[in-house]
């Protein structure tokens, strides 16, 4: 809800010593635009509007994250999340939190995602 987003913004403002990373699909709805813009303007916050795609596609300048099918050639400008190779831990990587990293790609994982990708490939 918008009220929840405003509360999240308040927490971000009150914790300037903490880096916040906000992956979101709410960027598509106009009622959230103002609060997401305010969040992104904070030096300790990285808002990552998520692409809805599961094939690695994204719109440059709009999306901050995308899902990459396993084995896919990584699109230019995408930093691949390394957590799957480090037991699900960031292990010092802070790409998701960095305003210098335009797009983070997350490798698709799990049985449900494999099924979704398989069905999409047949379409």
Please describe what each predicted stretch is.
Residues 1-123:
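Class I S-adenosyl-L-methionine
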């Amino acid at each position: 809800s918008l009220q929840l987003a405003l509360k999240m913004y308040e927490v971000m403002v009150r914790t300037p010593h903490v880096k916040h990373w906000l992956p979101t699909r709410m960027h598509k709805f106009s009622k959230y635009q103002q609060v997401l813009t305010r969040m992104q303007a904070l030096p300790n916050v990285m808002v990552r509007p998520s692409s809805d795609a599961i094939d690695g596609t994204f719109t440059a300048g709009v999306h901050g994250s995308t899902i990459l099918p396993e084995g896919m050639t990584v699109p230019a400008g995408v930093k691949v999340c390394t957590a799957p190779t480090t037991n699900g831990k960031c292990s010092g990587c802070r790409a998701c939190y960095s305003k210098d990293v335009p797009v983070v790609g997350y490798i698709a994982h799990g049985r449900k995602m494999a099924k979704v990708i398989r069905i999409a490939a047949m379409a």
